[in-house]
Design a protein with these regions (language model features):
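A short beta-loop-alpha structural element at the N-terminal edge
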Residues: 8-22, 26
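Conserved GNAT-fold acetyl-CoA-binding loop/helix
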Residues: 31-54
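A short helix-loop-beta-strand connector motif used in the catalytic cores of GNAT acetyltransferases and
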Residues: 47-68, 122-128
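Conserved beta-hairpin
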Residues: 61-79, 135
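Conserved acyl-donor/pantetheine-binding loop and adjacent beta-alpha core of acyl/acetyltransferases
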Residues: 76-133, 139, 189-193
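Conserved GNAT acetyl-CoA-binding A-motif
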Residues: 125-128, 154-167
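Conserved acetyl-CoA-binding loop-helix of GNAT-fold acetyltransferases
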Residues: 140-153, 177
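Conserved active-site alpha-helix within GNAT-family acetyltransferase domains
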Residues: 145, 157-159, 168-185, 191-192
Length: 204
């Protein structure tokens, strides 16, 4: 299904993975969490692009049919639906070979970070916004909000909460405007950056 909604958002398909990965890599190139996971600047952009395409999009987001794009590939939101918002042990094991190829010697560091993030992840059924990224040249146009509204309207209609981790004060401010509230504290290991777990109850 590639039908575009009234907001200009469409459900992404597997063939969109390379373009969406480029958008995410550009959006998160200087993100403090991305820098922590991949500290070597010289090859960070290329490795981010490979990680988004080969791991997060092809193996996680797109198979769940809850990854959305807007204005072609200018913005992307990767959601995981209720009941699938946490990766089980077997899922994580299946991802390890692809992660090892992309992350190389940074794999142990990444696994520690993922473990810290998972430790505060709520168990109650919810929609999980794994990542939301907009091409830097298109930021400030409201594309992120339009991507958010697409699934948050469904959350409200189905009376299901939503959860995410914001990685910057700027993204946290966006999510606060859309009804999310702070839900505890999270800091990545080894004096890593702060993240903001956020929870949103469905609105009437």
């Amino acid at each position: 299904m590639t039908t575009m909604t009234p907001t200009g958002v469409r459900r992404a398909q597997m063939q969109d993975a390379p373009a969406l990965a480029r958008t995410l890599a550009r959006a998160f190139a200087d993100d403090p969490v991305s820098v922590w996971f991949l500290p070597r600047q010289e090859d960070r952009a290329a490795r981010l692009r490979r990680a988004y395409e080969q791991v997060f999009l092809r193996r996680i987001g797109l198979p769940h049919e809850a990854t959305f794009s807007i204005d072609g590939h200018a913005g992307v939101a990767l959601w995981l639906p209720p009941g699938q918002a946490r990766l089980g042990v077997l899922d994580q094991l299946r991802l390890l070979p692809a992660m090892a190829v992309v992350l190389g010697r940074d794999l142990p560091r990444a696994l520690r970070g993922m473990s810290a993030i998972d430790a505060v992840h709520p168990h109650e059924p919810h929609w999980y916004l794994w990542m939301l990224g907009v091409d830097p040249e298109r930021q400030g146009e409201g594309l992120g909000s339009r991507l958010l509204v697409e699934v948050l309207a469904r959350c409200d209609a189905e009376r299901v909460p939503a959860y995410l981790e914001a990685s910057t004060e700027e993204s946290r401010a966006l999510y606060l405007r859309h009804g999310f509230e702070d839900a505890g504290e999270l800091r990545l290991p080894a004096d890593g950056p702060r993240m903001w777990p956020m929870w949103r109850e469905p609105r009437p």
